[in-house]
Amino acid sequence: MNLLRWLPNLNRTIWILAAGRLLSQVGTGFTLFYLPIFFVNEVGLSATAVGAALGSASLSGMVGRFWGGAAIDSPAWGRRRTLLISMLISSLGSFALAFANDLVALVLGNLLMGLGIGLYWPATEAVVADLSPLEQRGEAYAITRLADSIGLGLGVVLGSVLIALAHAYRALLIADGLSFLIFFGILYAFIAETIKPNQKQHTGLKGWKIALGDRSFLIYIAVNILITTYLAQINSTLPLYFKNFARQGLGFSELTIGTLFAWHLGLAILFQLPIARWLKPYSYARGLMISIFFWGTGFGLIWICGVAPAGGLIWAVLALGLMAIAMASYTPTASALVVALAPDSLRGVYLSLNSQCWAIGYLIGPALGGAAMDRPPGLANGYWLMLVGSIPVGLTILKALERQLQRVSRSTDLEYTNHSS
């Protein structure tokens, strides 16, 4: 009972959505960290080719996000129908990857996955915002992200065991496709449309022009692309680095890699809600500064994991722990900031552009990381120092965002802090 009292009192539909996201993310966790290893070490493609193929999902994701951003603000489409279509497309992408044996098929599967994900994220984030009052919005996003992390963690653990025992990569991809179909059923049966029937609608490109003319939002977009490039390293570059370069080239086994990422997700689960509550007194910009600091420290420890003569596993554990804190600090803060900036009638457009940052970050991140992993150990190790070197850039942009939000707050009486979200 004490645990139940500790949980926020959210709309019932948010809990149902979180349950569906958890089940879907179990399927994603089956394959998320193993796709690069499978297609490089088992299928025989180069790390550069696989990185580019994984990044191709971002191209179709951009299309999906633009389509989804307009669709979810339209009463004719809305949040629910967009979510249902996204699940069907994502399941097709998983099944395509399950039977891929060459680069063309790998790219096709990733293009479908990217399109489905592009439609999914703006719609699901809009549903959470629609159903949560301002004072609960940060915790509502934390709960849905918590469900994502629990599902991913379970999927990673189960996936690593099955891969260690049977190398059943393709079976896990099929299971991922089935998880999307299960989520489709939950959405169809239990999630009603949340868009307001009388909501004002902006036709044509007007809504996009308003969003792209928002100076605060544009500054946020710049730093968000950088942070999502960091996020992309976790499931695209890090698994291959751990396998082929960690411990001065000795690497870790698939089971060890799976355990490391289960640890990472476990900490993200443990910290998600406490960190969301801890960040309430801080401005959104300060919350993102905290996140970016932990990203930089984590990347530095990954470099040590590769070059240290001993203790590589310990450094990997510490690095992924810090990255879990970075992720838990980032996700609810970023989503709540975007909703705070967006007019209600343009919530889908703003969330779509926010999601585009993920598409761009996941286009740049795997391509850069894959190219680095095709280089000699010195360059592969140095890649992490390059990421550390980008941290001051992110902090500088966030200081500019903080000043801009303070100016807007003084002129509009709006307060851009987590306790108003």
Question: Which residues fall in each region the model found?
Answer:
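Helix-loop boundary and gating motifs at the non-cytosolic
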Residues: 8-58, 218-223, 227-260
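C-terminal membrane-cytosol helix-exit motif in multi-pass small-molecule transporters
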Residues: 179-197, 397-402
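Cytoplasmic helix-loop-helix junction between adjacent transmembrane helices
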Residues: 111-148
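Conserved MFS/SLC helix-loop-helix module at the cytosolic interface between two early adjacent transmembrane helices
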Residues: 63-99
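Juxtamembrane intracellular "pre-TM" segments in multi-pass secondary transporters
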Residues: 1-11, 193-222, 416-421
